[in-house]
A protein has these predicted regions:
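Rossmann-like S-adenosyl-L-methionine
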Residues: 1-123
């Protein structure tokens, strides 16, 4: 098994590499770049996808490419409910269903929440 992480912030990629090394993980590859541009270079079909896009959600072209992988399950983490709703509308129209959803208060005493959705491919 292999973990591939794509992150636009270079410092976050370096931190992920350092964290993987500190934990003795040698099956991780972290790529710095925009997922829309990098996704075409990832030829292996993932078993599972975890999405944590910026506030505006996933670029529609990137979302289409992610859907084409046809994974059975994915996690979508969102910090903006309207972006999540827009992307979930596309995902559900393309054969995914929301299995579970919960809100996580990552920023106490603020008006912000993270929403975590577990999606699965409809049979």
């Amino acid at each position: 098994r292999k973990v591939i992480g794509v992150e636009i912030v270079e410092e976050a990629v370096e931190a992920a590499k350092e964290n993987a090394a500190l934990n003795g993980l040698d099956n991780c590859e972290f790529i710095a770049g925009d997922v829309l541009k990098v996704i075409d270079d990832i030829e292996e079909k993932p078993d599972y996808i975890i999405l944590d896009p910026p506030r505006d959600g996933i670029h529609p072209k990137a979302l289409e490419k992610i859907i084409r992988y046809g994974v059975d399950r994915m996690i979508y983490i969102s910090c903006k409910p309207t972006s999540l709703a827009r992307d979930l509308e596309v995902l559900t129209a393309r054969g995914y269903q929301v299995e579970r959803m919960c809100c996580v208060d990552m920023f106490p005493w603020s008006g912000n929440i993270e929403t975590v959705c577990m999606l699965s491919k409809k049979d």
